[in-house]
């Protein structure tokens, strides 16, 4: 377990990287204003939100009825959190003023006892706290707490923080194991993360302790939600209270060994577990996290960093069950996976956590947003088929193109808050030094050194760290060496001199410890095209091959490859080349050109004894995150091999 972590990184790390800074500029210029209009129902032709109107109604500022999902409040919370991080990246007085006005409305919507939730305030005030399984009161509170902490950190304004501290006190008075309290747990984990953020910015131990209560209490009574339903006698969605694995209530967190149930609920819980393990130096809780991490990432995760194999419960299924065309792989789940990975790094600086964080960031998360920032995927498939995907039973959730918005719109604002707080995922600062998890271009000002990273990652493997020391003490600069880099293949120079790093790599990190002055560390990661094969236990991918270059997963689209994608076979020694796209939507991206055989059916018979005709051709593969931006067409990550 690590000591001396310094979590407040947002104001220390500025993203300068062309790739990620481009995303941040897109979010600030397009996505945040677009989502603000969505929340105000100002965009025609997309799903109605009504989220801000709900707050105005609850505040008594206008007349009307509640509209939306029971967790509609969380869309506003995540938007506010994203706005806070955006204001750190690029101050914007007008945006801040609009956010302040939203916060004023939220404050007025809070009830006298500290309670805050527009659904129950407007629609069912008599049912408050009676349906933790289905109704997301604690979930919404958690997201608003995260927003409050972020807004306070960045702007210094504490109005929303005071609102959510009142809500936290209200929750603390109601839930717990003490006499007179309800031993409740959230139906959707998130309150734990919100409370930990309040603890982070206020230092108040009771918030941390309450978060631990919610984690420790889960699964102690697997029948809690059964009893709750019997007691209240009414339902909202008729969720199956007997499916205890759905919300990870089937066992205590220490007894859970497999990633099960709703994938977002799971990774939010795992994130809180990992953070609590770090804060309390709890080896037992960290080991519980390790067990879940190992099962999830080694047996239940897609090559893209997607998790959740089925639409039924938006959930994990069983080991090695990873279908490509009926997949779920919700954007929020991959975001939660990044949260979990980052908190695991706070316990142990282990490259396997940075590897998964990198995989999800460059693939299964940004695939959830269109390149123009105005459309979004909830589900991130690895195979689509026009006429089937989004249309036929069993495939309706797998859309071939991104829609403008969703009734359940959890993913778009989640993408925003992650991208705008990216700096704290790229670096860690500890008492003994700093650690670079992903070699993206940054300007970082730490306590013991300043670091500027020059990089064109993920397209180019050359990365240069410019270090200016601030202390006479020896200090560590740790640089993650991705697991896709073959041992001995990375080139390292320090102040122009070649360095053998064989003895300096610990758990996937190059550890450089010295008194830093004005120094330069240059690394060259070999960015070769790699053929990837799945474990044969993954039946859908047996006999298939996928392609990666650096951290990027590639896919094939019909728009680039005429005919049926299933008709192409890639032979074992196929020639593979790369080229930089010079124009269009994918300008600047590295494309792959791969030799293949194309099979064509002879005649029109459904079945025939005549073998298909084979011809040689060249396929084009594009980065997975870019798919679906050029119209509806076929897409596949895994291609048939020979």
Report residues per predicted region.
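Low-complexity, Ser/Thr/Pro/Gly-enriched N-terminal "stalk/linker" regions
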Residues: 1-75, 100-120
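C-terminal beta-rich recognition modules with glycine/proline-rich loops and embedded aromatic residues
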Residues: 12, 211, 289, 351, ...
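Extended ligand-binding groove/face enriched in aromatic
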Residues: 57-71, 77, 81, 86-189, ...
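Beta-strand-rich binding/interaction modules
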Residues: 472-495
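Well-ordered alpha-helical scaffold segments within catalytic/enzyme domains
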Residues: 20, 80-93, 142-157, 191-204, ...
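Solvent-exposed beta-strand/loop surfaces of large extracellular or lumenal domains
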Residues: 487-512, 531-537
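Solvent-exposed loop and edge beta-strand segments that line ligand/cofactor-binding
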Residues: 3, 59-76, 127-140, 173-188, ...
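Catalytic-core region of carbohydrate-active enzymes that cleave or remodel glycosidic bonds
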Residues: 275-299, 322-374, 385
């Amino acid at each position: 377990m690590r000591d001396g972590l310094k979590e407040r990184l947002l104001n220390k790390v500025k993203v300068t990287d062309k790739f990620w800074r481009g995303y941040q500029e897109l979010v600030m210029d397009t996505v945040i204003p677009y989502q603000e209009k969505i929340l105000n129902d100002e965009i025609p032709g997309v799903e109605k939100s009504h989220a801000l109107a709900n707050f105005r109604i609850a505040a008594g500022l206008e007349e009307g009825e509640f509209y939306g999902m029971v967790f509609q409040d969380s869309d506003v919370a995540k938007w506010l959190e994203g706005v806070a991080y955006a204001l750190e990246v690029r101050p914007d007085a007008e945006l801040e003023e609009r956010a302040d006005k939203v916060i004023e409305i939220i404050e007025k919507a809070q009830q006298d006892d500290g309670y805050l939730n527009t659904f129950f305030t407007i629609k069912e005030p008599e049912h408050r706290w009676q349906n933790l399984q289905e109704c997301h009161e604690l979930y919404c509170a958690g997201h608003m707490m995260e927003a409050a902490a972020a807004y306070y950190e960045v702007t210094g304004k504490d109005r929303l923080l005071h609102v959510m501290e009142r809500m936290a006190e209200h929750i603390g008075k109601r839930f717990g194991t003490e006499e007179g309290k309800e031993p409740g747990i959230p139906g959707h984990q998130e309150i734990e993360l919100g409370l930990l953020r309040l603890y982070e910015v206020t230092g108040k131990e009771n918030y941390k302790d309450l978060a631990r209560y919610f984690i420790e209490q889960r699964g102690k009574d697997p029948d809690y939600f059964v009893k709750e339903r019997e007691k209240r006698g009414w339902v909202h969605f008729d969720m199956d209270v007997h499916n205890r694995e759905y919300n990870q209530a089937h066992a205590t967190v220490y007894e859970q060994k497999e990633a099960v149930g709703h994938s977002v609920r799971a990774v939010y819980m795992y994130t809180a577990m990992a953070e609590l393990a770090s804060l309390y130096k709890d080896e037992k809780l960290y080991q519980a996290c390790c067990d879940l991490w190992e099962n999830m990432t080694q047996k239940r995760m897609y090559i893209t960093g997607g998790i959740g194999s089925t639409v039924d419960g938006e959930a994990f299924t069983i080991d090695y069950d990873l279908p490509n065309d009926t997949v779920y792989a919700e954007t929020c789940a991959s975001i939660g996976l990044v949260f979990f990975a980052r908190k695991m790094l706070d316990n142990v600086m282990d490259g396997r956590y940075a590897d998964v964080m990198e995989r999800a960031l460059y693939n299964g998360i940004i695939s959830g947003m269109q390149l123009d920032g105005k459309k979004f995927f909830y589900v991130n498939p690895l195979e689509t088929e026009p006429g089937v995907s989004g249309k036929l039973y069993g495939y309706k959730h797998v859309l071939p193109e991104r829609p403008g918005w969703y009734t359940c719109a959890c993913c778009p604002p989640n993408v925003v808050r992650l991208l705008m707080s990216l700096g704290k995922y790229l670096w860690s600062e500890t008492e003994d030094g700093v650690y670079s998890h992903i070699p993206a271009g940054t300007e970082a000002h730490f306590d013991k050194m300043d670091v500027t990273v020059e990089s064109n990652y993920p397209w180019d493997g050359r990365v240069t760290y410019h270090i200016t020391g601030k202390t006479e003490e020896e200090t560590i600069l740790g640089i993650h060496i991705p697991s896709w880099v073959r041992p001995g293949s990375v080139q390292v120079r320090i102040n122009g001199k070649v360095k053998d790093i064989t003895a300096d790599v610990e758990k996937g990190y190059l550890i450089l410890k010295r008194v830093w002055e004005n120094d330069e560390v240059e690394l060259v990661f070999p960015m070769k095209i790699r053929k990837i094969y799945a474990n044969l236990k993954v039946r859908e991918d047996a006999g298939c091959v996928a392609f990666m270059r650096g951290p990027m997963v590639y896919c094939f689209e019909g728009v680039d490859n005429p005919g049926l994608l299933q008709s192409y076979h890639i032979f074992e020694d196929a020639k593979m080349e790369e080229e930089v796209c010079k124009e269009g939507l994918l300008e600047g991206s590295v494309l792959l050109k791969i030799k293949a055989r194309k099979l064509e059916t002879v005649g029109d018979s459904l079945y025939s004894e005549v073998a298909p005709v084979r011809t040689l051709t060249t396929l084009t593969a594009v980065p997975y995150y870019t798919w679906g931006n050029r119209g509806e067409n076929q897409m596949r990550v895994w291609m048939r091999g020979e």
